[in-house]
């Protein structure tokens, strides 16, 4: 262990990472630098400073990354209308490359030769953190305690904390039975009763959203203004990216929007059930499809849809910093120059309903699409030749006896 002199630890201040901090100090006999990120998880991050100081940490980084998170990670991802396996909006996945980036930046700034994280050896996060770290700093050493130590239960972690004088909270507050992760895009729940795929989640599990049954009986209308594929204003009031997502979370949560219960395929090979609340993201996805429906060329839109599952898998599996993701991002971003305008939505009891869309860059031409007299804008007789030419290969096949009729 003598080759490790200084480690940057992704530190939440909770039991797991506090034990990891002390374990790193004792096992590697090294200096530990802590990094705590505010990604909009809704918890105080400053208490992590006092806990780190109590464990002898001299260099402590606590960073408000909310704007960077939404501007440089969430918004670019949503430009692709990204969904993993048809449902998951990648709330956890998209936060990991930013944390990895900041870990490496701090390692470079402090002269650390290693980084460490609290992800377990069973999940996707270990892959996401480490792929990002190696992409940004090829020679960095990564220490993953959950793959090295024998503290494989909460009871063992508690015993270790008590033995080594690590401050832990014992204020009688009922601990959630779920493993949770939160940021400005979503909150996730795993474990507990959710490990039985037949058992319904409990209503009191949800923290951000009302149940659709308890949502207001009167719908909420909202207008979202897009510029270059990103939301820049809500109801005509300009907002920063983090403010946009925060306000949509509030509106969506109030109207019972954004709950999800799925079984997903983890990159490490197992299936895992998770429940998610993504109110703002659910609204953004619906609105983006609406504004693109009038501003994107048909073939561009279809190509984006074809490539989206690949793009989603790259993010889910931890390849945000890979050359293929960066290549796809350039193509996606190039498609967004005309994605400008306003989408009007009705939010009602778990539903996001598009009720209007307009744009100065719209490709929708009412004079051509009308069911009424179009004044010669579209010659319906032209359709006969179009159909015959497109049927040519099938007509030839049928003439050779290859039709499907018996």
Curated annotation (Swiss-Prot):
Q: Which GO terms describe its biological process?
A: argininosuccinate metabolic process; L-arginine biosynthetic process; urea cycle
Q: Where does L-aspartate bind?
A: 120, 124-125
Q: Which reaction does it catalyse?
A: L-citrulline + L-aspartate + ATP = 2-(N(omega)-L-arginino)succinate + AMP + diphosphate + H(+)
Where does it primarily localize? cytoplasm
ATP-binding recorded as keyword: yes
Give the top-rank taxon of the lineage listed in the UniProt record for this protein: Bacteria
The record's keywords, sorted A to Z, are:
Amino-acid biosynthesis, Arginine biosynthesis, ATP-binding, Cytoplasm, Ligase, Nucleotide-binding
**Known EC number(s)?**
6.3.4.5
Q: Entry's InterPro entries?
A: Arginosuc_syn_C, Arginosuc_syn_N, Arginosuc_synth, Arginosuc_synth_CS, Arginosuc_synth_type_1_subfam, AS_cat/multimer_dom_body, Rossmann-like_a/b/a_fold
Q: Where in the cell is it found?
A: Cytoplasm
Q: Where does L-citrulline bind?
A: 88, 93, 124, 128, 179, 188, 264, 276
Indicate which residues the UniProt annotation says bind ATP. 10-18, 37, 118
Q: Name one GO molecular function term.
A: ATP binding
Q: In which pathway does it act?
A: Amino-acid biosynthesis; L-arginine biosynthesis; L-arginine from L-ornithine and carbamoyl phosphate: step 2/3
User: Could you tell me which SUPFAM superfamilies the record lists for this protein?
Assistant: Adenine nucleotide alpha hydrolases-like, Argininosuccinate synthetase, C-terminal domain
Which spans are transmembrane here? none
Parts forming coiled coils = none
Similarity section: Belongs to the argininosuccinate synthase family. Type 1 subfamily.
NCBIfam families per UniProt: argG, PRK00509.1
Subunit: Homotetramer.
What is the name listed in the Swiss-Prot or TrEMBL entry for this protein?
Answer: Argininosuccinate synthase
In its UniProt entry, the species of origin is given as: Azotobacter vinelandii (strain DJ / ATCC BAA-1303)
